[in-house]
């Protein structure tokens, strides 16, 4: 759900942090529905609790290198307001805080991970107490995680996946069609 919502949001002049935070809220809603978090998705994101499950940014620019130089602009221009907002919401792991412009090539890759060492660290430090249900989370310690990446180019009116609409199957219906169920 987060992946497709993010893909629909990528458009010229859209603040990247808004897209990143939308992905976090959608993922938090899913974790709440599984009983792994309590409260509201907004509270989980504001507390930084989603960094336990998505300890990376939503994506990155692509250009001369696979991971293009996001931080160059942040060193050259004053993004202090955005950086302050990111630090407060626990999204300081998001490297790209720019506004999206036509011609930008970037990735859309929200993910969810269950990293035992990170879970243990946050639990021991009492982080996200009242938000994360660490006892329920124990059942997912061996799950690992998942992240699906699409590469996107921003157009004058929106965006499109590089390679067109052809992608690997990712939904339950798509996967069942491939395996013949």
Give the positions of each predicted feature.
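Active-site neighborhoods and metal-handling regions in enzymes and metal-associated proteins
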Residues: 1-181
């Amino acid at each position: 759900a987060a992946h497709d919502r993010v893909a629909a949001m990528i458009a010229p002049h859209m603040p990247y942090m808004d897209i990143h935070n939308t992905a976090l809220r959608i993922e938090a809603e899913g974790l709440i529905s599984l009983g792994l978090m309590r409260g509201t998705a907004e509270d989980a994101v504001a507390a930084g609790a989603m960094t336990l499950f998505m300890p990376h940014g939503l994506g990155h620019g692509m250009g001369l290198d696979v991971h293009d130089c996001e931080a160059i602009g942040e060193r050259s221009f004053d993004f202090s307001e955005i950086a302050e907002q990111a630090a407060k919401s626990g999204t300081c792991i998001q490297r790209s805080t720019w506004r999206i412009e036509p011609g930008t090539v970037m990735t859309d890759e929200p993910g969810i991970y269950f990293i035992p060492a990170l879970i243990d660290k946050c639990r021991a430090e009492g982080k996200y107490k009242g938000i994360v249900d660490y006892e329920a989370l124990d059942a997912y310690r061996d799950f690992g995680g998942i992240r699906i990446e699409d590469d996107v180019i921003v157009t004058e009116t929106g965006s499109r996946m590089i390679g067109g609409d052809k992608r690997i199957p990712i939904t339950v219906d798509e996967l069942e069609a491939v395996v013949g169920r």
